[in-house]
């Protein structure tokens, strides 16, 4: 799928945070796209700073992989404002949304005003339901964003995708069962408890630690 880049002009200016999920960068290189990097710095609490230059496509990941920090509503509103002012598209990786526990962190970017005009969100069943290697994910492309993007995506999918494999489909469907939801919630709490235990241990020995609250992983210095 190359993370949706096939939807956009080859000359589009792409912004990717550093560090981030490496597939973003690999996908852009596979399509011979030019990429700019936005450093995520400790002094900014690993929050990407809003750029002063114009970019057409911005990759944001929340909870961030690999740092583990999730972005608040107040913070994301600044990115949406930037996208509106610069006619940009935010590609919003939200595959760990079920791990979010903080009340000021949205479970979806679409909780925020004007986000449907600026953002394409992608999610995954496999992270929440513990079958990451099997793979089952989906995009949300609002009609408000641009009437042509949804149409082009459907044409692209019809011609280049034969469908999710049957095992993954059954796993995704089963995740909506009442019994499955109980197991999924138990597992998510288990993973978050493990992350908290690791975080507390590192903090005890005076390491600096981020993440582990709205994500099942931590970043240690």
Put a short name on every predicted segment.
Residues 1, 20-24:
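Conserved coil-to-alpha-helix start sites within the AMP-binding
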Residues 1-13:
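Phosphate-binding glycine-rich loop
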Residues 112-189, 196-200:
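Conserved core segment of the aminotransferase class I/II
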